Amino acid sequence: ITGRKVIRTEQSSGTGNGAPGITDGEKASKPDLKKVSSKMQMIQSIIDQVFLYDEDATEVEEYIYRGMMAGLNDPYSVYYTAEDYKAIQESTDGSYSGIGAMISQNKTTGLCTVVKVFEGSPALEAGMKPGDIIYKVGDTLVAGESLDVLVSNYIKGKEGTDVQITVYRAESDTYEDMTITRRKIEVPTVESKMLADNTGYVAVSEFDAVTVEQFEKAIDELENQGMKQMIIDLRSNPGGMLDSAVAMVDYILPDDRKDFEKGEGKTLIVYTADKNGKGDTYTAADGHEVDVPIAILVNENSASASEVFTGALKDYKKAVVVGTTSYGKGIVQNLIPLGDGSAIKITTAHYYTPSGFDLHGKGITPDVEVELDENLKSQSVVTPEEDNQVQAAMEALKEN
């Protein structure tokens, strides 16, 4: 999850397994930058004297910065070039030039898997399906690349240009090559409809700058249509901006829930703590409440800001959680510009649900556990009537 200095998560983000490798009670030694500088000058002198080929100074510098962040042994702390950073900023505004697919990274294997293909997208037209593993982009094998780099440097690009992607399909043990023409992708991060029994259905694909307004509008429209209960679908939502998740919880909960002491008389939504025990506390303040029974759908790819949202409503018993255990990413990254157009993303804190639960590495266990039917997992479009997890949420609402 990301906050802002400018601050953002991922995407979904992207997701990995663990926090910086400093155990409690240990002091991290800082690198001796004077010694490092001296050694770099020595290496540069050798390059100048004997290196056979032309040196690309810009590329060398960028690898130095990337290496410094990689040395933290934290998959979420990375360096972004000015080009990378610009692409990330564009993606938070809800539009970009790309293929129209959502990709998740396995925290253990590092494999990048397609979890959703948007309707009408060039990815769907090319035959990409949920479950496809990204094997190669162009001539580049992407194994070991972070999700941020894979998306920003390889998949996104200039509108109208082609990208060659090779995917692996485990069910058929085959590799599929596809040529996808990048287009301007306008992705609504919130989709809504009214289901049977006046059940409002709101699917949130990620928490971006545009998501709060879309979410509030969707709920208002469903309430005007006579909504009596609601399903909020966060399956395969990789997270995003902490402020957006907080604002959306705020829209649902009243301001005066005093269940948890740390809220100091206000409705506590989430709080963070850095390595010194300092952090931020987020409470409800908008005066709005959604007063209908709620079910939240999650799965193993629901991460970060999705878990902030789910954890808060679960702690207040405002929602029943349905699906499979969520991803378990309970740490905060800050996205910090460096003044020359580049930026770093760095892990700064743990976050905790209102009850004090640290879900990092654990995830949120659903109240009603149900796997998606196997035959639905590779389908790009599944109707609520076909979706056994949506139907399980409908049943859970009847029982609650």
Residue positions per predicted region:
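Short acidic, Pro/Gly- and aromatic-enriched capping/linker segments at domain boundaries
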Residues: 338-340, 344-350
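A short, sequence-level motif marking secondary-structure junctions
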Residues: 180-186, 350-351, 366-367
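Conserved helicase C-terminal RecA-like lobe
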Residues: 367-400
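Flexible, low-complexity junctional segments that flank or bridge functional domains
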Residues: 1-229
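Cleft-lining beta-strand/loop regions that shape enzyme active-site pockets
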Residues: 115, 124, 138, 149-329, ...
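Generic structural signal for well-ordered beta-strand positions
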Residues: 176, 359-360
